[in-house]
């Protein structure tokens, strides 16, 4: 059960008002926190609970729901051989969250990818620019309201091979 997990117990003690949900599925614990508290929670997990490896940051688009977006952090404690998932909901009107690059350098490119694909604004990111799409690309291709056929664009005229 998630309630018996050491990390969940510690987070409930320190961030009772910031935690929105705690679940466990197939041994994987997920905590959902208010976006305003994301850096404090991630720092506690890193410094106090030894979740020393940020494996991924991504986003999910729940078009038609409020909140529309969920930013998802996958953390691993190498010393404790444990994983935890941390989620933070974002509304469509305020699609921004603090960058985790101050805690983990590995957040750099994955936050840029979430920005590029979903339009999530990672505040205080050192270089929040597109990483996969061209600089002139309009829109964010993994949003559920992005046109399936893609935007009308001129065919590529450069060398293909």
Swiss-Prot record:
Gene3D superfamilies: NADH:ubiquinone oxidoreductase, 30kDa subunit
Entry keywords, A to Z: Cell inner membrane, Cell membrane, Membrane, NAD, Quinone, Translocase, Transport, Ubiquinone
Reactions that this protein is recorded to catalyse: a quinone + NADH + 5 H(+)(in) = a quinol + NAD(+) + 4 H(+)(out)
GO cellular component, one term: plasma membrane
Keyword Cell membrane among UniProt keywords: yes
EC numbers on record: 7.1.1.-
Primary subcellular site in the record, as a coarse category: membrane
Protein location: Cell inner membrane
Entry's family note: Belongs to the complex I 30 kDa subunit family.
Protein name: NADH-quinone oxidoreductase subunit C
Record organism: Citrifermentans bemidjiense (strain ATCC BAA-1014 / DSM 16622 / JCM 12645 / Bem)
């Amino acid at each position: 059960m998630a309630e018996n997990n050491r990390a969940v117990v510690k987070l409930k003690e320190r961030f009772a008002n910031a935690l929105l949900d705690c679940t466990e599925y197939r041994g994987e614990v997920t905590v959902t926190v208010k976006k305003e508290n994301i850096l404090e929670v991630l720092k506690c997990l890193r410094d106090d609970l030894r979740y020393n490896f940020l494996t991924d940051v991504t986003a999910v688009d729940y078009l038609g729901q409020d909140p529309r977006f969920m930013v998802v952090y996958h953390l691993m404690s190498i010393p404790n051989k444990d994983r935890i998932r941390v989620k933070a909901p974002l509304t469509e009107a305020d699609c921004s969250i603090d960058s985790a690059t101050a805690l983990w350098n590995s957040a750099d490119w994955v936050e840029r990818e979430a920005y590029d694909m979903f339009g999530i604004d990672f505040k205080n990111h050192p270089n929040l620019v597109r990483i996969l799409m061209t600089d002139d690309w309009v829109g964010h291709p993994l949003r559920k309201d992005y046109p399936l056929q893609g935007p009308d664009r001129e065919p590529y005229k450069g060398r293909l091979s």
